[in-house]
């Protein structure tokens, strides 16, 4: 029953993704009895981070709202209502201490307690946009660092940024203003594990994207280290893209990578055109053209997407530019359980690197053309084969890049010829008429 319930929630979120500018997201600033926001953790600062056009803190190129407007081509224009700080009665460890399996013990209770305290300040009914009885989403930014930045065990009591459901966590129904709480996401105030630099928008955009239905594309098992999508996807390590503004040797997540073609189509923002017949293809930058292609195998759930990615805009901190080819091996249950790339022998959403090296340390060789590799065929390296060994039999050859424009031949590259369209005949006589086109 819980899995069905989860899919229903995801359906609601995807509907929200195409809601234009009629979306308000609730963001609660939450601090604990023993951990308060730093001096930079003010309501105004986070409101700007969420909503200010052209937000530029620590090298950012826009706010979270700017990011989603850009990725959706204006189809999704959320406004984030920032409330707080709200001080909870319990310590951070009460919510964030780890259980025997390494999971936070009560993060869902943090959300419940925060909403209860915010009830006098917030009209939760306006956040049930589809009027289904559930608050669409509660987002919490909590004081301090996230456990995901822990490198020495000092942050074990902190909360790990994540997206989840109240009912699945607390196993109970909780309501505010007559609306049930359920979908929530959370992330930390501060970047890294020291200093007072606010976290970039990347983590927020990543976690908020879960509420639009997208799963993680990194290995969520914590056991293996499969490559997945690396920094090429917001739903992997691309959420950390950006400059090293504080000089600690790490990017700060202030300029997260743009959505992939798959992610845009998943949210209903574009339609990826299938290549089926021989043609010579010209492909402009995805960020500008909203155009991408896919090549589908005999198993319709296994296919490859092709998109032109350039180092401009939100993609400016990518490792390289060119044609990005991504293998998709869709299984709804795997997506629902958020285990897309946990199986080493069957990663289901992963880049096909032009240099044939599946590693975050070689990402500058991932996009085509690279070092003489200008083809993606049944016999190329990497090969155009599905996870189950199906050969596409639909070669992509002669991949070139010129001035940010990608061209390639599909199945031999016969140019498309558009037949002339005849106009309606005029001056018709009993013996004939002049042809017009």
What label would you give each PLM region?
Residues 7-51, 99-104, 144:
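Fold-level signature of zinc-dependent metallopeptidase catalytic domains
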Residues 38-89, 150-194, 264-415:
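Non-catalytic C-terminal accessory/binding modules of secreted extracellular proteins
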Residues 94-109, 113-116, 192-198, 211, ...:
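A domain-level signal for the mature, folded cores of soluble proteins
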Residues 140, 202-217, 306:
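Active-site recognition of the HExxH zinc-binding catalytic motif
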Residues 414-437:
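Pro/Thr/Ser/Gly-rich low-complexity, intrinsically disordered linker/stalk tracts
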């Amino acid at each position: 029953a819980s899995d069905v319930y989860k899919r229903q929630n995801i359906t609601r979120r995807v509907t929200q993704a195409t809601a234009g500018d009629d979306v308000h997201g609730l963001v609660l600033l939450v601090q604990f009895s023993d951990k308060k926001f730093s001096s930079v953790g003010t309501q105004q600062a986070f409101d700007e981070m969420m909503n200010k056009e052209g937000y530029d803190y620590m090298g950012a190129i826009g706010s979270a709202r700017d990011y989603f407007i850009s990725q959706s081509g204006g189809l999704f224009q959320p406004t984030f209502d920032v409330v707080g700080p709200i001080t909870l009665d319990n310590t951070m460890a009460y919510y964030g201490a780890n259980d025997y399996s390494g999971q936070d013990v009560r993060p869902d209770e943090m959300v419940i307690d925060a909403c209860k305290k915010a009830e006098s300040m917030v009209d939760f009914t306006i956040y049930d946009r589809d009027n289904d009885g559930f608050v669409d989403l509660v987002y919490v930014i909590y004081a301090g660092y996230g456990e995901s930045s822990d490198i020495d065990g000092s942050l074990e009591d902190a909360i790990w940024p994540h997206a989840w459901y109240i009912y699945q966590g607390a196993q109970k129904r909780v309501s505010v203003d007559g609306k049930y709480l359920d979908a929530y996401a959370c992330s930390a105030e501060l970047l890294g594990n020291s200093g007072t630099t606010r976290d970039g928008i990347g983590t927020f955009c990543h976690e908020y994207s879960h509420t639009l239905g997208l799963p993680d594309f990194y290995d969520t098992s914590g056991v293996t280290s499969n490559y997945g999508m690396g920094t090429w996807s917001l739903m992997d390590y691309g959420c950390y893209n950006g400059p090293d503004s504080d000089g600690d040797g790490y990017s700060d997540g202030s300029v997260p990578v743009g959505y992939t073609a798959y992610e845009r189509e998943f949210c209903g923002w574009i339609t990826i055109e299938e290549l089926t017949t021989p043609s010579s293809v010209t492909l402009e930058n995805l960020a500008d053209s909203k155009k991408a292609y896919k090549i589908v195998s005999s198993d319709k759930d296994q296919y490859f997407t092709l998109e032109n990615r350039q180092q401009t805009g939100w993609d400016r901190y990518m490792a390289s530019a060119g044609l990005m080819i991504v293998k998709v091996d869709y299984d709804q249950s795997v997506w629902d359980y958020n285990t897309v790339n946990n199986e080493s022998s069957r990663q289901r959403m992963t880049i096909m690197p032009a240099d044939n090296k599946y590693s975050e340390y070689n990402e500058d060789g991932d996009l085509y053309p690279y070092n003489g590799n200008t083809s993606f065929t049944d016999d190329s390296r990497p090969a155009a084969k599905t996870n189950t060994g199906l050969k596409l039999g639909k070669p992509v050859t002669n991949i070139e890049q010129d001035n940010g424009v990608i061209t390639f031949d599909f199945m031999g590259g016969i140019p498309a010829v558009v037949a002339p369209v005849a106009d309606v005949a005029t001056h018709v006589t009993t013996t004939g008429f002049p042809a017009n086109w």
